[in-house]
Amino acid sequence: MDVVKARLGALKGLGETFLGPRDVVAVDIGSYAIKVVLLKQEGAALRLKAWGHLPIGAKAEASPEERKIEIINSLRGFLIEKSVGVREAATALSGNAVIVRYVKFPRLTKTELQTTLATEAEPFIPFDINEVQLGFYILSEMVEDGQKKIETVLVAAKKELVAARVEILQGAGLTPAIMDVDSFALENVHERIRDRKEGQAATLYLNIGHLVTNLSIVESGVTRVVRDVFISGSTMTKAIAKAFQCEPAKADELKKRHGVIVESTEKEKTLAEGNREALGVSQAIGQVARDLVGEVHRSVDFYLSQGPDRAIARIVLSGGTACAKNLDKHLSGELKVPVTVLDPFVFVSGAEAVPADLRPAFGVAVGLALRRNRDWE
């Protein structure tokens, strides 16, 4: 692990940031699929050189070891098939084994904070400090109550999670170079697509994956709130499976086919046709969406309480569930904020082959691939 730690690029500063302009292959390992992206800078443009959406075939009852082997073999096979020569990899973590805290420390230099990080961070981390890998990024310097301080993003990831991810990458023939957090990877995409005319108004991201939803609020290019919410695509699938007393695979198919009914005219038509299947699916998704809306409200209230003149300008959906039919419209109606679905390839040339319904799932992977052009000193 010492060798690996010396080469890791950052959980917003984990280890030494060593990459310059070299390319990295981005590997986003989700619970449902592996997303792989390789970008190449060609003059002023970014070109997609390789991409892959690799469903994880391991069965639900598969052991962690069986699942790991499945992921390694799938990833290695893809790299060989696509003749990907780049061997330095960027990946990201999320879930309940990763903690992100915004902390104010007495003003220290980066070197001083690196030396004393474990001591300074321990009060803010709900894990044994010896069981986590720590990283940090200094956001700003300030004076508070007459004392000089630094505002810092503090990240802690359980060492066993970091080691497991490193083992997968190395098993596939890759060298772990950068380890980030899902929400911070999305921040890189945000920098490319954000409208500077929005000023201080923030964007809320909902990266709705299979098991976890990454919620983040980005203000002026800086992520100010990060949460992982365990209301996700699989939660919707389970609700549909319960309502129809069917297998998860069938429920997932129904979710993709029907989505949620939003317009009153569509609802009236569905009722007139007696389409109980569509109505039942919409009701099941709607119930889960209400729980997600509640979590969004809590996060927004927290963000607004942190300072004056704060507002959410829009919400951006990403992740594999973002394309669920009418989910964006439903959330917009519930939250009274414009909601759009992310296309992380909108500024990338050569991405025409990526299907529209898969694009939102690549938000984290594209953000990781951008780390070649945006790193921290």
Predicted ranges, named:
Residues M1-E377:
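Hydrophobic/aromatic-enriched cytosolic interaction surfaces used to assemble or bind macromolecules
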